[in-house]
Amino acid sequence: MENSKKQSFQDMLDYVHLYRLKNKLLRETADNDRKIRDNQKRILLLDNLNQYITDNMSIQDIRVIIGNMRDDYENRVDDYAIRNAELSKERREIRRKMAEHSSKK
């Protein structure tokens, strides 16, 4: 009897841990979504800025800088999208473990 209570308590602690971890991952995913959106806006801003800079301004270097900045922002968007995919996979695994805990009862 005592052993089953300990196991039941441990199962509850595991479930609470998984639930909190799942919520943490959801918050992190939402944060990454905001970062993706922000960086996509920056990409658009740089595209618009690039339209206003002309060659007769003799600032060809600015175009190179803007291109590099744009690439950096695009890379960030890709990195955040990859991270979101990893978080989503981890959330699915946690949901599966939580379902296993629930079915033990």
UniProtKB/Swiss-Prot annotation:
InterPro entries on file: DUF496
Family: Belongs to the pole-localizer TmaR family.
Pfam family, one: DUF496
Keywords of the record: Coiled coil, Cytoplasm
Principal location listed in the UniProt entry: cytoplasm
Signal listed as a keyword: no
Subcellular locations according to the entry: Cytoplasm
Coiled-coil intervals, chain numbering: 70-104
Protein purpose: Pole-localizer protein involved in the regulation of several cellular processes.
GO cellular component: cytosol
Domain of life per record: Bacteria
Protein name: Pole-localizer protein TmaR
